[in-house]
């Protein structure tokens, strides 16, 4: 927990999801405020965890500070904002007894930002959310175009590893990537002397 706090204070961006800081490495529940060791970093504390039935969802609405809305599933964590130095809610639960509680929040900590996701959302939400977080953090995608679902791109220097995790082949910019395969793509190096 301290390493995450130090990283964020120095300008890093951290995303914390539901179930974070509930138990230790021996699977014993922490006593006291949770997420354990992260309440100051996140600007909130978890008060309760509500498990949802299969197929049940809880709608979450955007706040004035957030532009997204989504339905949470699996569970809904109920968190209260810290009295001093609270997080800024980006989405609030819109129904049930936790209506008005933060479902997604951001907290400025030192030179960085810490995000808290209190429920499980769908893939479209995560795509939009992480695109916004990466843009704010100044991160560039490993591949310039939107990739099909199930395809991962990881950049290492002038190389991009394209991984197809699908049970079917996909076409990426005219190159077929077979099912369950990896392809190495070499990018053209940028000559910094030629930039003006």
Residue spans for each PLM region:
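A conserved amphipathic helix/loop scaffold
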Residues: 1-196
């Amino acid at each position: 927990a301290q390493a995450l706090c130090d990283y964020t204070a120095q300008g890093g961006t951290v995303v914390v999801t539901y179930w974070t800081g509930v138990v230790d490495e021996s699977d014993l529940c922490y006593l006291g405020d949770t997420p354990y060791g992260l309440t100051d970093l996140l600007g909130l504390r978890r008060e309760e965890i509500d498990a949802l039935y299969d197929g049940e969802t809880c709608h979450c609405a955007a706040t004035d500070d957030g532009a997204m809305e989504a339905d949470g599933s699996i569970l809904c964590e109920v968190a209260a904002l810290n009295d001093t130095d609270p997080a800024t809610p980006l989405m609030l639960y819109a129904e049930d007894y936790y209506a008005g509680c933060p479902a997604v929040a951001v907290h400025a900590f030192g030179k960085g930002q810490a995000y808290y996701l209190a429920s499980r959302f769908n893939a479209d939400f995560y795509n939009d959310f992480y695109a916004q977080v990466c843009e704010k953090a100044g991160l560039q995608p490993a591949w310039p175009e939107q990739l099909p679902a199930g395809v991962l791109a990881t950049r290492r220097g002038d190389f991009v590893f394209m991984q197809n995790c699908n049970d079917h082949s996909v076409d990426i910019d005219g190159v077929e990537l077979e099912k369950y395969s990896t392809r190495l793509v070499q990018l053209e190096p940028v000559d910094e002397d030629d930039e003006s």
